């Protein structure tokens, strides 16, 4: 969805039971908040659903969606991403960001040289990761979204500043002076 007025807050991972409930995966910091952001819409905005969380289940919630009455209706929605109006989401502290706000920002190194852009943001459990894209960058370059690696995020200016770890791009070589060759120990 290219609509900046909406943010993806969850996805339907399938049906739950035989009464039209869906299995809902929440992308919210507080997962149960997904039910409080008002009607949620599909990516294209063609469908809008009122969400009622019925109970927690493995990897999400069982939920009833308005207009979904049968298991077949729920099965048909598998993989559907749900979007909330940006105005319904809480404002964040200065050091927190919505993933959607980071995608597309220009990435600069600490010397002010343009490296590329933020292609996506992911979190697989150990913290946020930025995927960078741009000329001269390896395809799918991933960096940790930590204060040490990304000391500056300026949404208003449309940029992030990255202190790139040695060895990730270009001719940088990691410092291996404190490592022994494979199979040997330091004395």
From Swiss-Prot:
Its main location: cytoplasm. GO terms for molecular function: ribosome binding. Residues 167-187 are annotated as: Disordered. Pfam families: PRC_RimM, RimM. GO terms for biological process: ribosomal small subunit biogenesis; rRNA processing. One of its GO terms (cellular component) is cytoplasm. Residues 94-168 form the PRC barrel domain. The keyword rRNA processing applies. Transmembrane segments: none annotated. Keywords: Chaperone, Cytoplasm, Ribosome biogenesis, rRNA processing. It is found in: Cytoplasm. Belongs to the RimM family. Binds ribosomal protein uS19. An accessory protein needed during the final step in the assembly of 30S ribosomal subunit, possibly for assembly of the head region. Essential for efficient processing of 16S rRNA. May be needed both before and after RbfA during the maturation of 16S rRNA. It has affinity for free ribosomal 30S subunits but not for 70S ribosomes. HAMAP family: Ribosome_mat_RimM. The PRC barrel domain binds ribosomal protein uS19. This is Ribosome maturation factor RimM. The lineage of its organism: Bacteria, Pseudomonadati, Pseudomonadota, Alphaproteobacteria, Rhodobacterales. The gene is rimM.
């Amino acid at each position: 969805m290219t609509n900046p007025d909406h943010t993806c807050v969850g996805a339907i991972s399938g049906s739950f039971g035989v009464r039209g409930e869906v299995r809902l995966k929440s992308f919210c910091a507080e997962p149960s908040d997904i039910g409080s952001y008002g009607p949620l819409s599909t990516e294209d905005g063609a469908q809008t659903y009122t969400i009622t969380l019925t109970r927690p289940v493995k990897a999400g919630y069982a939920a009833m969606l308005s207009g979904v009455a049968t298991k077949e209706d729920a099965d048909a929605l598998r993989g559907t991403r749900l979007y909330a109006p940006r105005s319904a989401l809480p404002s964040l502290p200065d050091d927190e960001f919505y993933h959607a706000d980071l995608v597309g920002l220009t990435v600069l190194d600490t010397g002010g040289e343009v490296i590329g852009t933020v292609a996506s943001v992911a979190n697989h459990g150990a913290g946020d990761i930025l995927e960078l894209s741009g000329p001269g960058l390896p395809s799918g370059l991933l960096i940790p979204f930590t204060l040490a690696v990304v000391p500056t995020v300026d949404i208003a200016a449309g940029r992030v500043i990255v202190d790139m770890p040695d060895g990730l791009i270009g001719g940088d070589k990691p410092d291996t002076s404190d490592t022994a060759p494979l199979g040997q120990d330091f004395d």
